[in-house]
């Protein structure tokens, strides 16, 4: 008898833009042991930015992308790397009222990406 693997629930990240031009990502993950990072990978290049995911007050993991971290213009795909495994992030709630030049968005495949430019 063959047993099917239980499908893994998608990881979602809520995004909040601040008035200084930074973004905060809140990610809900299962089994929060070990090292965790939010990875931004430039779609048309080989550049990656690693942001530490740290425990937040609500039990989720939080990463901050301050305005001082320069990202070249383009589209950046968002991933969560937890305990050595990497998974594509899907968008959750997005409060982009203060967004300026860095805009998280849902791709046509339902994934979370970040568009940078002026």
What does each of the following model-derived ranges do?
Residues 1-118:
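Basic, ligand-binding patches in group-transfer machinery
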């Amino acid at each position: 008898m063959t047993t099917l693997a239980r499908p893994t629930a998608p990881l979602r990240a809520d995004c909040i833009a601040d008035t200084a031009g930074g973004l905060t990502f809140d990610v809900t993950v299962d089994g929060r042991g070990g090292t965790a990072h939010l990875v931004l990978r430039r779609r048309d290049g080989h550049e990656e930015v690693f942001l530490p995911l740290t425990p937040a007050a609500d039990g989720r993991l939080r990463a901050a992308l301050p305005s001082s971290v320069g990202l070249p213009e383009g589209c950046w795909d968002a991933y969560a790397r937890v305990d050595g495994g990497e998974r594509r992030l899907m968008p959750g709630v997005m409060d982009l009222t203060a967004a300026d030049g860095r805009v998280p968005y849902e791709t046509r495949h339902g994934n979370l990406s970040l568009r940078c430019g002026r």
